[in-house]
Structure formats: structure tokens, C-alpha cells
A protein has these predicted regions:
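Short, surface-exposed loop or secondary-structure junction motifs
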Residues: 2-174
Length: 174
């Protein structure tokens, strides 16, 4: 039910070259957010592709949703553990959290967006990081130290387009 699904590789998902529409671009997504990943994915099923896989670049949050769910299914445990073990711990990102349960919610900034009242901090799909940790991560990403091999680094170097600022109602990372 995803157009060209049989032609999309994991690399295309990582590089935002899959052509799969982003669920955040679906009308009313922000006004009526889904309750789980199945509901989220259903928002883009049967929609036309943005383009044929591998031919263009288009930032799609759906790609990350699919990658996350694949990791969980294949590994048999949460993608949170993978992120902690492979990224957060090696980079000593001690002020980055995978769950609201890990932090004092009164210590986290609340988002504000004119015309949109809900705060989008939710359990399970959100990460929280201090500005310092975000800076450390971006530095490691750009100098390649977050990657374990040249092959991993090449995936990032081949596609990175400075265009997405992490915008969602009430929050913007750059």
C-alpha cells in the first residue's frame, strides 16, 4: 500500500530518497495527531509517492517511523536501546533522554505555537536533549566520529541537505 514499496531500500529510507510521503505533511496531522505508529503509518498508505524511489530527495518523517519499527521487529527490543548504546553512550550525551520518565518534566521547555495549544511532548516517540548535547551530536555527525565505519559515514555524506530545521508546532531545533 506504499507505492513502489518493492523498489525501496533501507538506504533510500535513511537518505530520504524513498519518495514515501511524510505523515507530517498530511492535512490535519497536527490537529488530530495519531495515537500510535500504526495509526501514523495509515495516514500515508495509498497516497501517491512524491517521486520514483532513488530519483530525488524529500525529507520524510515516515522514513524514520518505518526504520524505527523495522529495528524493533528485527532486533526484538526497543530502538531506544540501540540509540543509547550506539550513539548516546559513546558520545557521552548524558543530557539526552529517550523518555519523559527519565526527566523531571518541569525542567523541560514547553513548546508554543500560535493557533496550536497542545504541547507535543509525548511518551515513546520523542527525544529530549540539552542544547549542549545537540551541539555535541551535530559536531560528531559532521566530523564523522558518530560513525563506526567509512561505509556508514558515506551514507550521511552522500545525502545531507541542510534544509530541515526540526520544525513542529512549538519547537524548532535550529
Amino acid at each position: 500500500r506504499i507505492e513502489y514499496a518493492d523498489q525501496i531500500s533501507l538506504r533510500m529510507l535513511v537518505q530520504h530518497r524513498s519518495g514515501i510521503p511524510s505523515f507530517t505533511d498530511v492535512p490535519d496531522f497536527w490537529l488530530n495527531p495519531p495515537n500510535n505508529s500504526q495509526e501514523t503509518l495509515s495516514m500515508v498508505l495509498d497516497l501517491p509517492a512524491q517521486f520514483k524511489p532513488g530519483t530525488e530527495y524529500y525529507y520524510s518523517n515516515t522514513n524514520y517511523l518505518l526504520l524505527r519499527d523495522l529495528l524493533d521487529q528485527i532486533l526484538g527490543y526497543s530502538h531506544h536501546e540501540v540509540v543509547k548504546k550506539e550513539i548516546l553512550q559513546p558520545l557521552s550525551l548524558d543530557h539526552t533522554y529517550m523518555s519523559l520518565k527519565e526527566v523531571n518534566s518541569t525542567q523541560i521547555m514547553s513548546g508554543f505555537h500560535v493557533g496550536y495549544t497542545p504541547d507535543l511532548k509525548t511518551e515513546g516517540d520523542t527525544m529530549f536533549a540539552s542544547a549542549e548535547d545537540v551541539g555535541l551530536f551535530i559536531r560528531a555527525l559532521n566530523n564523522g566520529s558518530v560513525f563506526k565505519s567509512e561505509k556508514e559515514a558515506a551514507i550521511y555524506k552522500e545525502i545531507y541537505v541542510y534544509e530541515h530545521t526540526g520544525l513542529m508546532p512549538g519547537y524548532q531545533s535550529i
